[in-house]
């Protein structure tokens, strides 16, 4: 389906895109006139453009024009050398001739070689009425459609702008959070050094405790030895006491005699 655009958009597209070919399309009206429109084909475009031209009388056969079947009761179309030329839109550039080469010569397709330079336009299957054309044009994009698209683009642009501001604010927040993380990292590093120093102190204290335990163990062994000696001395004292008691008894016996 060709895409319908405005004359202004067509002129802009003609300046920015390379035009490849065009053909004239006619639609039969009830008053015997044809509605002529030029269908342009552009390079690197996935659609064609129909540019409306003013109403023209019935057109006979020509290189780029095909004559359709006559409607019953309609006037006969002239068929002869005196063919009226197609009316041209003043804003529409003439694309029937290609760009001139160096030296002022035209591309092939001039009067010396009429069989070259133009692509043959296929004959339309049938002519359509105004109503049928309007039904088909409903599928084409209109100025209102372009306006809606422009509005959507404006909304998307504003949305992207707002999102860009939000991303900028979030970037500042992330940057501030990064600084906080760096400060926390330094604090954790200092605390780690302190914990490491405390660990060294605890390790030294543990070594001291081990040495004290060893000394306590040695003192315990000495205490045990002293207890054994005290026990032995106690037994010796008991023997001495018993000996003294026996000696006292003997003395008493001797005195009584």
Curated annotation (Swiss-Prot):
Compositionally biased region (Basic and acidic residues): 80-104, 115-132
Region entry Disordered, spans: 49-132
SUPFAM superfamilies: MPN010-like
Gene3D superfamilies in alphabetical order: 6.10.250.40
Highest taxon listed in the record's lineage: Bacteria
Protein family according to the UniProt entry: Belongs to the UPF0134 family.
UniProt protein name: UPF0134 protein MPN_013
């Amino acid at each position: 389906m060709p895409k319908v655009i405005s004359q202004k958009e067509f002129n802009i597209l003609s300046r920015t895109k390379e035009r490849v070919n065009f053909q004239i399309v006619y639609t039969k009206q009830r008053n015997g006139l044809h509605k002529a429109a030029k269908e342009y084909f552009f390079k690197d475009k996935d659609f064609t453009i129909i540019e409306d031209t003013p109403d023209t009388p019935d057109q006979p056969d020509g290189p780029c024009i095909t004559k359709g079947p006559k409607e019953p009761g309609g006037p006969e179309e002239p068929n002869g050398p005196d063919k009226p030329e197609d009316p041209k839109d003043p804003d529409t550039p003439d694309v029937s001739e290609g760009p001139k080469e160096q030296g002022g010569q035209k591309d092939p397709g001039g009067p010396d070689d009429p069989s070259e330079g133009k692509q043959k336009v296929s004959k339309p299957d049938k002519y359509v009425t105004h109503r049928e054309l309007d039904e088909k044009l409903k599928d084409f994009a209109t100025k209102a459609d372009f306006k809606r698209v422009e509005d959507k683009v404006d909304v998307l642009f504003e949305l992207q702008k707002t999102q860009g501001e939000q991303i900028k604010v979030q970037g500042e927040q992330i940057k501030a959070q990064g600084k906080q993380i760096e400060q926390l990292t330094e604090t954790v590093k200092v605390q780690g050094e302190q914990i490491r120093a405390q660990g060294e102190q605890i390790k030294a204290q543990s070594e001291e405790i081990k040495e004290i335990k060893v000394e306590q163990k040695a003192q315990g062994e000495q205490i045990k030895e002293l207890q054994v000696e005290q026990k032995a001395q106690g037994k010796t004292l008991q023997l001495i006491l018993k000996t003294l008691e026996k000696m006292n008894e003997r003395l008493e016996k001797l005195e009584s005699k």
